[in-house]
Amino acid sequence: MSDYSVDPDTLALRLSGLVPEDGSHVRQVLYDEIETRLPRDPEARINIQLSELNPGRTASWHVHNGIVYFALLRGIVSLQYKDRSEHYSAGDVYTEPIGVVHRAHNPHPEIAAALIGFWVTAADRPHITEVVAPTWVPIDQPHPSLG
């Protein structure tokens, strides 16, 4: 059982009651995996971003040049790939593949999605490379929370 909840009216991650009255802080693991895709060079570029995606909007097509992890703080996001869609809601933590063309879409009509991203890329590469829109049509399955 998780120690957080998602408010259905705002689709926002709510942390409540995590820190006991006699304690100073609590750590909660949201994602813990062995990662083989991290750069092995002596240096890596690390970037932490807060991103927002407005209701009904779609990000541009792009690829990641290194590993990226996202924590979705508010709203819903659908990732569109050539062969599949992936759907996430507030409270989810996920990673996106390296070098695979995709885009993020916020299918909610009213709530902006808010995410924190943690990026690790080889020092000589940009985190993201924008790409020309592909000629194929992405799989666009509806987000389960809207359907």
Model regions: which residues?
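A short beta-loop-beta micro-motif enriched in histidine and acidic residues
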Residues: 43-44, 55-69
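Ligand-binding loop in jelly-roll beta-barrel domains
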Residues: 78, 98-126
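Glycine- and acidic-residue-biased ligand/ion/polar-headgroup-sensing regions
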Residues: 65-83, 92
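Short acidic-glycine-tyrosine-enriched beta hairpin
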Residues: 53, 82-101
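Conserved hydrophobic/aromatic beta-strand scaffold that supports enzyme active sites
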Residues: 48-52, 69, 93-95, 117
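Extracellular/periplasmic catalytic domains that process cell-envelope and extracellular macromolecules
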Residues: 40-41, 63, 71, 107-112
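Extracytoplasmic low-complexity repetitive segments enriched in small/polar residues
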Residues: 36, 93, 115, 119, ...
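A short, N-terminal "cap"/entry segment at the start of jelly-roll beta-barrel domains
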Residues: 1-45, 131-147
